[in-house]
Swiss-Prot record:
A motif (Bipartite nuclear localization signal) lies at residues 102-110. Residues 1-175, 303-372 are annotated as: Disordered. SUPFAM superfamilies: AF0104/ALDC/Ptd012-like. This is AT-hook motif nuclear-localized protein 8. Signal peptide: none annotated. The PPC domain mediates interactions between AHL proteins. One of its GO terms (molecular function) is minor groove of adenine-thymine-rich DNA binding. Residues 102-114, 155-167 bind DNA. Keywords: DNA-binding, Nucleus, Repeat, Transcription, Transcription regulation. One of its GO terms (cellular component) is nucleus. Residues 54-70, 328-337, 361-372 have a biased composition (Low complexity). Residues 126-135 have a biased composition (Polar residues).
């Protein structure tokens, strides 16, 4: 017996039950098919990628992607992957095409390169024009009149229509003026401001409107209804806060007359404020500058009632135009209880072309102003009447 042939030992490890093993003769021999686990799944195939041209690799990837898409569609039941079922791919191809279209950024051009306007008006639809024509023809048969088509709405211009401001003045009962010109009147120390304004109005037939003034006064006579005498005289240094008024021209029986009024608000040395209508002197304590404006008022002719015309009565004389705003009550003359102011004989704001300046005693005979003249600045002081 050869020593090389060693009999198998009884102590050799036996395979566990349930496992088949081949005979231990050749360890390098191929494994028995009994050792290979059985499986119903197909083996995973790993295709080799060519290392050649890059274009070939891209083509291979595209073919593989198409195969995967076809299998996915078949598994979902959307088709067999044929070209007829390609549009049902959830819009993937449409999205890819939209991404390929380049979108222009920014606002579109208003003018084309040739210089013409790119944004033109859309032409009128022929259906709309035909409908409008048929509507006009139908209106002819129904109404029997002229069946013209409805004109397009006219574009309305922006701003106030011409002539509307004059209508507003007519509604307020006033008239407009023309040729407004500003002026500055210099009043020296010790001069009467009211007399200066009246002297300035004598230079022409224009209406005077007092706008403002700056300076101080030393003596002023004001009309105040709360006082027992009705007229109060203040002496001292008073700063002018506001000075306003007007000088009006009006005709009575063919003669031109002037009538004016003046209102002032003054600040005393102790901080108190006094004011009212000026009925006498307004003496300047320092040099005073008065800013006035002159213009030509367009007076309206009074309307004659049909009753007066039928009876042959003369119409009422025209009074001062009502468009001027009176910035204070018109002085009707000093009160009979104050004798000191009557004896002073200070000039008032009434003047006639024939008689000149009326004194304080003659003011009661002067014709009063138009009753429609307005009162302003009455709320600035509680003691002011009218």
């Amino acid at each position: 017996m050869d020593s090389r042939d060693i009999p198998p030992s009884h102590n050799q490890l036996q395979p566990p039950p349930g496992m088949l093993m081949s005979h231990y003769r050749n360890p390098n021999a191929a494994a028995s098919p009994l050792m290979v686990p059985t499986s119903t799944s197909q083996p995973i195939q790993h295709p080799r990628l060519p290392f050649g041209n890059q274009q070939q690799s891209q083509t291979f990837h595209q073919q593989q992607q198409q195969q995967m898409d076809q299998k996915t569609l078949e598994s979902l039941g959307f088709g067999d992957g044929s070209p007829s079922s390609q549009p049902m791919r959830f819009g993937i191809d449409d999205q890819n095409q939209q991404l390929q279209v380049k979108k222009k950024r920014g606002r579109p051009r208003k003018y084309t390169p040739d210089g013409s306007i790119a944004l033109g008006l859309a032409p009128t639809s022929p259906l709309l024009s035909a409908a409008s024509n048929s509507y006009g023809e139908g209106g002819v048969g129904d109404s029997g009149g002229n069946g013209n088509s409805v004109d397009p709405p006219v574009k309305r211009n922006r701003g106030r229509p011409p002539g509307s401001s004059k209508k507003q003045l007519d509604a307020l009962g006033g008239t407009s003026g023309v040729g407004f010109t500003p002026h500055v009147i210099e009043v020296n120390t010790g001069e009467d401001i009211a007399s200066k304004v009246m002297a300035f109005s004598d230079q022409g037939s224009r209406t005077i409107c007092i706008l403002s003034a700056s300076g101080a006064v030393s003596r002023v006579m004001l009309r105040q209804a709360s006082h027992s005498s009705g007229i109060v005289t203040y002496e001292g240094r008073f700063e002018i806060i506001t000075l306003s008024g007007s000088v009006l021209n009006y005709e009575v029986n063919g003669s031109t007359n002037r009538s004016g009024n003046l209102s002032v608000a003054l600040a005393g040395p102790d901080g108190g404020i006094v004011g009212g209508s000026v009925v006498g002197n307004l003496v300047a304590a320092t040099q005073v500058q008065v800013i006035v404006g002159s213009f030509v008022a367009e007076a309206k002719k009074p309307k004659q009632s049909s009753v007066n015309i039928a009876r042959g009565q003369n119409p009422e004389p025209a009074s001062a135009p009502a468009n001027m705003l009176n910035f204070g009550s018109v002085s009707q003359g000093p009160s009979s209880e104050s004798s000191e102011e009557n004896e002073s004989g200070s000039p008032a704001m009434h003047r006639d072309n024939n008689n000149g300046i009326y004194g304080a005693q003659q003011q009661q005979q002067q014709q009063p102003l138009h009753p429609h003249q307005m009162q302003m600045y009455q709320h600035l002081w509680s003691n002011h009447g009218q």
